[in-house]
């Protein structure tokens, strides 16, 4: 099999396991090289698993999250690298406080773009994935991740940009991952009802107007990867500080998910080769 290379760019450790993880596991299993690039260490992330909300964990959160990322990458079968920036945290309140001076979201765009361009030129991916302009949700690091990823995609092949950052490499395609679609959540919620159970997604669905499911309309590419859903879930559980094993994410049985929604969804944002959506592969149209 000819080797193709996929780079998934994420803001924090755990994002790679909740957004497109089964697709990464599938391509790695098929013999392609898959690299996850994590832009920050997640140092300012909250502890979302009550069992991990302990003084010792708080005191070692950066170290623990690095270990969690190592485990998740091993489970998915992917390569991994850190870009080395510091988590910005998620400001809260009607008048949220300013972001910390040392955080990723405040690093000049040229600086963070050059750092990612170095990785792109070294790994030489055919395809990159990242978040859309809204970051998937409005965390400052997710929005910055989008900006940096798009900038690196555009700059990596330009020999005039960042001439000291390695030999230029042109990435063929850039995708946005769309992991949380209302249609999917509604389908699983309805399946709970058919089994006489109260589904866990009622409150989430209440916030979304079913007549304005704009993310679904942006999807161009659906990758069949149901065989790897269990790996996806195991990788997410490896991020024990960030996910409660009893959380809604794991509520729907895998058998339901595999039958009702066996794909992960992406939006082809930029392409330097002819593209004919709808697609079923991120590497569609690419020859190594």
Curated annotation (Swiss-Prot):
Enzyme class: hydrolase
InterPro entries per record: GlcNAc_PI_deacetylase-related, LmbE-like_dom_sf, Mca
Cofactor binding notes: Binds 1 Zn(2+) ion per subunit.
Reactions this protein catalyses: mycothiol S-conjugate + H2O = an N-acetyl-L-cysteine-S-conjugate + 1D-myo-inositol 2-amino-2-deoxy-alpha-D-glucopyranoside
Molecular function GO terms recorded: hydrolase activity, acting on carbon-nitrogen (but not peptide) bonds; hydrolase activity, acting on carbon-nitrogen (but not peptide) bonds, in linear amides; zinc ion binding
GO cellular component, one term: cytosol
Activity regulation description: Partially inhibited by MSH when MSmB is used as substrate. Competitively inhibited by the GlcNAc-cyclohexyl derivative 5-(4-chlorophenyl)-N-((2R,3R,4R,5S,6R)-2-(cyclohexylthio)-tetrahydro-4,5-dihydroxy-6-(hydroxymethyl)-2H-pyran-3-yl)furan-2-carboxamide, which also inhibits MshB.
SUPFAM superfamilies membership: LmbE-like (SSF102588)
Cofactor(s) the record lists: Zn(2+)
Binding site for Zn(2+): 12, 15, 142
Ranges in coiled-coil conformation: none
Keywords assigned by UniProt, alphabetized: Hydrolase, Metal-binding, Zinc
Biotechnology: MSH is a glutathione analog and is essential for this organism. As MSH does not exist in its host (human) enzymes that are required for its metabolism (such as this one) are potential therapeutic targets.
Enzyme Commission code(s) on record: 3.5.1.115
Keyword Ubl conjugation set for record: no
Pfam families, per database record: PIG-L
Quaternary organization: Monomer.
Function: A mycothiol (MSH, N-acetyl-cysteinyl-glucosaminyl-inositol) S-conjugate amidase, it recycles conjugated MSH to the N-acetyl cysteine conjugate and the MSH precursor. Involved in MSH-dependent detoxification of a number of alkylating agents and antibiotics. Activity is specific for the mycothiol moiety. Has a low but measurable deacetylation activity on GlcNAc-Ins (N-acetyl-glucosaminyl-inositol), and thus can also directly contribute to the production of MSH.
Similarity remark: Belongs to the MshB deacetylase family. Mca subfamily.
The name this protein goes by in its record: Mycothiol S-conjugate amidase
């Amino acid at each position: 099999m000819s080797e193709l290379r996929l780079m998934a760019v994420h803001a924090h450790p755990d994002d790679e396991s909740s957004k497109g993880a089964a697709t990464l596991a599938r391509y790695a299993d098929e013999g392609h090289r898959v690299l996850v690039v994590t832009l920050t260490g997640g140092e300012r992330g909250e502890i979302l698993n009550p069992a991990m909300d302990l003084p010792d964990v708080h005191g070692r959160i950066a170290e623990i999250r690095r270990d969690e990322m190592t485990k998740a990458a091993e489970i998915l079968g992917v390569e991994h690298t850190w870009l080395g920036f510091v988590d910005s945290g998620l400001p809260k309140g009607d008048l949220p406080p300013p972001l910390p001076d040392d955080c990723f979201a405040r690093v000049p765009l040229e600086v963070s773009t050059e750092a990612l361009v170095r990785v792109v030129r070294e790994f030489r991916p055919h395809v990159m994935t990242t978040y859309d302009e809204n970051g998937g949700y409005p965390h400052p690091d997710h929005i910055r991740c989008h900006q940096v990823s798009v900038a690196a995609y555009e700059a990596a092949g330009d020999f005039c940009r960042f001439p000291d950052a390695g030999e230029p490499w042109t990435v063929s395609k850039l995708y946005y991952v769309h992991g949380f679609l209302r249609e999917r959540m509604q389908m699983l919620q309805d399946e709970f009802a058919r089994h006489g159970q109260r589904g866990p997604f009622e409150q989430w669905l209440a916030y979304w107007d079913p007549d304005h499911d704009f993310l679904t309309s942006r999807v161009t590419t659906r990758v069949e990867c149901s065989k790897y859903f269990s790996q996806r879930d195991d990788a997410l559980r490896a991020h024990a500080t960030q996910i409660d094993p009893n959380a809604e994410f794991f509520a729907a049985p895998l058998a339901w998910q595999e039958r009702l929604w066996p794909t992960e969804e992406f939006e082809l944002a930029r392409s330097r080769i002819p593209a004919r959506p709808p697609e079923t592969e991120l590497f569609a149209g690419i020859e190594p």
